[in-house]
A protein has these predicted regions:
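Acidic carboxylate-rich catalytic motifs and surrounding loops in phosphoryl-/glycosyl-chemistry enzymes
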Residues: 33-49, 146-149, 180, 396-397, ...
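Basic, amphipathic juxtamembrane/active-site segments
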Residues: 105-132, 218-224
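Substrate-recognition element of Asp-dependent hydrolases with the DxDx(T/V) motif
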Residues: 127-158, 174-177, 296, 309-314, ...
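Terminal substrate-recognition subdomain of acyl/acetyltransferases
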Residues: 213, 217-280, 383-428
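Acyl-donor binding region in acyl/amide transferases
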Residues: 337-338, 343-423
Length: 428
């Protein structure tokens, strides 16, 4: 940690060599998809070098980090590991007053709230909004839950548009009323087909955060005591939105949910759900060659919870293996309709063995539930099995609380139960 040569160490000494070595590792990680480099330099900088090392511990038992450093390191490592298995958070839900702007709009008025770089306090909240925008662009869903007047809030975003990076269009679901925030959050998650343990809620009030955590199952609520920047520090240190890669689907996620709002309007106008589906004019493109979508295929097996039959996930290198092996298979599909393109939303993979096609796992994004894509993909799998001379299709499901949505899937698709053990049900 010491720069024996002072600033010269950054150009030619140990500091320089360590930095060059780390840069080489980062470059290598772009070539090797399974190599993930943990940014220790950032973690140590955030902690502070003077508080990062513990020389007494090093001298005693060769453990170089301080207690504070160990906590920061372990939190970061846990976040990276969680990201590799798709266990990062999916949605951030935000309050408004004293959370993304300074002041209470109902009391201070639209022109009275502070937001933007023109005032010190306003700039702090501007930084909050910029941070939220970066999170949204990385594929995290953004929503609003605020005790406020809906029309007043709408006017704020219109009249103060030039001062704010965030706008209402970025919110996939907004609940702006005087109802308990936990109830609004539950409605948001239900509307977006998300589980409560995939959500983070931010609010200036510790009391509101307590109410949310008490009445929702798994939603983490974060507040601040002195400065709103504490919100960023807490989210950053806990690594709730750690990612190891960004797919095209991640970048378009906000648009996907915006399109779903238009589909909901169509449902209200339709005489029946069947008529609604017909009006969508849906098309799917089933792909057995995944060269451009390897990242997305792997991601779907990790991040999907509600339509995830066996919880078996695969890495990017595994996807390539399934494509290259004649005794294995993998398939993906997108879903396009007159409203928009949902992107790649489902993946299934498995084995061909003893005249049988075995489905090892099948996952589907919650964005396209109840659209008939499960029937369409199974039809393609049946055609594939027939072309290979396979006589049976075998599948199974591990019934857990998170995939309750699919507990009756096999029966709906025409499979017959052949046996069960504990929570595992086998079908043919």
């Amino acid at each position: 940690p010491f720069r024996v040569r002072g600033s010269l160490s950054s150009r030619s000494g140990l500091t320089f060599r360590v930095r060059e070595f780390n840069n080489a590792l980062f470059k290598l990680s772009y070539e090797l998809s399974n190599l993930i480099v943990q940014d220790i330099n950032y973690i140590s900088s955030r902690t502070g070098l003077d508080e990062w090392f513990d020389y007494d511990s090093w001298a005693a038992f060769k453990q170089p980090f301080s207690e504070k450093g160990l906590v920061a390191l372990s939190q970061s490592l846990a976040s990276v590991m969680a990201s590799t298995i798709g266990k990062t958070k999916k949605i951030i839900i935000s309050d408004l007053d004293d959370t993304i702007w300074s002041g209470i709009v109902g009391d201070d008025g639209i022109d009275g709230i502070l937001i933007g770089p023109n005032t010190p306090k306003g700039e702090l909240f501007y930084i909050i909004q910029k941070y939220l925008l970066f999170i949204i662009k990385s594929g995290v869903i953004f929503s609003i839950a605020s005790k406020n007047d809906n029309q007043v809030v709408s006017d704020v975003f219109k009249k103060r548009k030039g001062d704010m990076p965030i706008n209402l269009e970025l919110s996939s679901s907004s609940k702006i009323n005087w109802t308990e925030k936990s109830k609004n959050i539950k409605e948001i998650l239900l509307e977006l087909n998300l589980l409560s343990d995939s959500a983070i809620f931010i609010d200036d009030s510790e009391l509101e955060c307590l109410e949310v955590e008490t009445n929702t199952n798994g939603c983490i609520a974060i507040s601040y005591k002195k400065s709103p920047i504490e919100l960023i520090k807490k989210i950053d240190s806990m690594g709730f939105f750690e990612i190891t890669s960004i797919s095209s689907s991640d970048k378009s996620r906000t648009q996907y949910y915006k399109d779903n709002k238009e589909r909901e309007k169509l449902i209200e106008k339709s005489d029946s759900y069947a008529k609604f589906l017909e009006s969508l004019e849906m098309k799917t493109n089933v792909q057995w060659k995944l060269d451009k979508h390897i990242d997305r295929a792997s991601q779907l097996t990790k991040k999907t919870n509600q339509f995830n039959l066996t919880q078996v996930s695969i890495e990017k290198e595994d996807v390539k293996s399934y494509q290259a092996n004649n005794n294995k298979w993998i398939v993906i599909a997108d879903l396009v309709d007159k409203i928009g393109n949902n992107g790649i939303v489902t993946v299934a993979f498995g084995l061909c063995k003893d005249k049988k096609l075995i489905i090892e796992n099948w996952t589907m994004s919650c964005r396209v539930f109840n659209r008939g894509l499960d029937f369409a993909l199974l039809y393609e799998i049946l055609a594939f099995a027939k072309s290979k001379g396979l006589q049976e299709i075998h599948s199974s499901i591990n019934k857990i609380q998170k995939n309750k949505f699919t507990h009756n899937l096999h029966e709906l698709l025409g499979f017959k139960l052949t046996g069960k053990s504990d929570n595992k049900y086998n079908y043919v």
